[in-house]
Amino acid sequence: MSRSVISLERSTEAKKAAACPLEVIVSEAAKVIAPLWPISAFIARHPWMGMEDKSFVDAADRLQEAYGIDLYPPMAVFHAALSKGEIDVSFIERRLQRWLDDEPLPAPRHEAERLCRALLWNDAVPEEALQMPKLIELAAAMPLRSVSIRTRSVRLGLEKRLDQQMIKWCKLFYDRGEAVWALPHREHGFYGSWRRLAPLDPSLSKEERKRLFDWPHHPEEALQRALEQLGVQDEEAVAYLEAHLLALPGWAGMMVWQSRRAGDEIGGLINYLAVRLSLEWVFTAPHLPLKEEENEDDRAVGPLLAAWIHWGGMTLDDWRRLPLEDRQARLVFADRFWRIGRRHLWLEAWEDTYEAKLKEAVLTRQPEEPKEQAAAQLLFCIDVRSEPFRRHVEAVGPFETYGCAGFFGLPIQTRVLDSDDAHPSCPAIVAPRHEINETASPETAAPYRRRRDLFRFVGRTFKKIKRHLLAGLLLPEMSGPWLGLHTIARSAAPAWAGQAIHQAEMSAQQKPKTTLSLDCQGHDETTGLPIGLTKEEQVQYVKQLLVNIGLTSSFAPLVVVCGHESETTNNPYASALDCGACGGAAGAFNARVFAALANLPHVRDGLAKEGIVIPDETVFVAAEHITTVDELRWVEVPPLSEAAEAAFRQLKQALAGVSRQANAERMAKLPHVGAMPRDPVAEARRRAVDWSEIRPEWGLAGNAAFLIGRRALTKGVHLDGRVFLHSYDWREDPTGEALAGIIAGPATVGQWINLQYYASTVAPNYYGSGDKTTQTVTGGIGVMQGNGSDLLAGLPWQSVAASDREWFHSPLRLLVIIEAPFSYIERLLDENSEFRRKVQNGWLRLASIDPDSGAWVNWEAGRLASVQQR
């Protein structure tokens, strides 16, 4: 019953793409994949960002039916959630009734309802219903077709060889210094390099190499010719190229990322597809043209027909009397509901149950504004891991916390001391506008550079010896005793050895006191970006963040700007645990820049002219929340005023208890730890330095909601580390500009993170990266399973599941909640068509809380339609 039997008309995309230029066809096909960043700057990616013009249901139907990619959890997961109380049965019934109201039904309401309710709760039609002889006879007479897309190589069983060839060439092309020999002709692009080398490839037969003799040297020409030689018709070109992109979406996604980085939207994909389809033609040429594929599959009709007879209240005679069109419509209806509809209703019921519990937790208490002046105000990233830490900080003293995107509104790329490369320290959807450099005086930098150069020399020498043909034979004898001791120590006493090695590395890499290029100092020669900021820009960036989070008055003597970082060992996915808003890097640099800007006298003067008066006694300091050990580390503490010094001492004294409480809460969720570790801080530190630890922390697993509003709304509420918290005060935002910026930036990043976790959970073999213990880092850019697989784009299974059978992450679409008047939400949806489309098509959910009445309003399709018709 899982096989598709729907006969579809030509898709709208196919009709548009027929007879279109090749670039248009490739652009349309590219919507099924997403860019993939290198793993050193792992950024959460929304795998279906190009498909948001379709509804979530239609995208799921299309991917499952045509390519076998399932976007919904299996029924066993829904039943497990039901047994744990995470799904309320009443919501399932409510969603079913609403669905029946909205859907065109091929049968009387009572018959369709009986069928759907039975399919909701049953995994299969009873065997006796399937074995009725007359039913089998009727099923065999139904001319229904499957619509799965099968490329020529798949039909001939050559897809594995084609994938192996593509993996080999992609690894060579993208290598970042790992390979001993660099790929020749790389300057000619992916296709150009392959075209020059493929005729010499010994893995191709003599006949196959001969076929490439007069093959085009230009990628567009090669792709066009390959489509013609393979017999791909214009109307099927988009679907055919989609199938090839989805065969290895990781490598194709890397091609998209590199191409966009170079300012060419689809040039890289044309190169990639030109190589792939050229190879496909080379392999399949002796068998072309293929006979037209037979799509009929009478066997799949039986369970659908049996479902109507067994649960729909029909007899076989009733079925025979139906016109052929009605029978077909009923089968299509049952098939789509079985494959997609029923699980979508279960998903919505799961989401509704979570929303109801969150609504109760938030609205049962009256929001209270702070009654006393805070001693310290702390600005945290919206990351869900900040929520427990913020809650515990606020509980131990006169401290206020705020949430914002962890790049603190600074569209910068950063260049740390002596680095050759600059890192975009802002979200992937934001283009850097400035570069900030870290510098040190020659006197203080000299000792640091000597230590650094010594470590680099040792590392390079070891690497060269390891790769040398003869010297490599001596390396085990030379290094064996030392590496053996290292292995024994890290395995027998992971906490002690890991901590000792970590301390040694920190001491060796300890940087001298550095300064930041905050003021304008010309332009970067490579990127052309201005180094530093003008005085007006400095004022505006600080103002923008303070207004966005509603911190424009009542400043505490101490304001702590907290970036965040994760510290782990032997973890290729380390950047996935760092700050996504900082481009997959630690947030300390941005925190330091913002704090320094906010302390500048001319910035304070500029803010005062804008109506934001920061007292002279208020000092901004930079810190970093280490999420693996729930510790706050100081990045830069300038000279403090007397009041700020007192607040600093008070906060430091409270942080030890905060760390213990936050770690105890977090450790209890990790498998094999127990409800309450004897020493949660020690356990957290062990996991951070243990090189065998596959799950040092849960990261952002469990994320489910994004709340935009005052902290008074949620202060003291236990949100279980599942909610992104962005501070916002609608009273400070009469034009709605700040809200629009939060939705366009942080909320969109939150949606990407949410759908990355969703995809890695529901389709781990496709959108995840499998078992972390069997992965291999390849070319310095990503990971594979073993030494020959797709470039894995998602999260490892250990990031979303406690075991092979137990999921930790609940795959729910992000619920965005905004505390603002009704008119603010209407204006937002009216002006932001992209956000409205996300909500209307089900890629995220939207609710709002009226600040005056406390009413919780759901913004679903019907309400959105009324907004559009205003």
UniProtKB/Swiss-Prot annotation:
Q: GO molecular function of the protein, one example?
A: zinc ion binding
Q: Which cofactor does it need?
A: Zn(2+)
Positions bound to Zn(2+) = C381, D383, H564, C579
Does this UniProt record's set of keywords contain Membrane?
Answer: yes
Q: What keywords does the record list, in alphabetical order?
A: Cell membrane, Membrane, Metal-binding, Transport, Zinc
Q: Where does the source fall among the domains of life?
A: Bacteria
Where is the protein situated, by its record's location annotation? Cell membrane
**Quick check: keyword Glycoprotein in the entry?**
no
Q: Which Pfam families match?
A: DabA (PF10070)
Topology versus the membrane, per the UniProt entry? Answer: Peripheral membrane protein
Q: Name one GO cellular component term.
A: plasma membrane
Family to which the UniProt record says this protein belongs: Belongs to the inorganic carbon transporter (TC 9.A.2) DabA family.
Q: Which HAMAP family match?
A: DabA
Q: How does it assemble?
A: Forms a complex with DabB.
Q: What does this protein do?
A: Part of an energy-coupled inorganic carbon pump.
**Name this protein carries in UniProt:** Probable inorganic carbon transporter subunit DabA
* Gene source species: Geobacillus kaustophilus (strain HTA426)
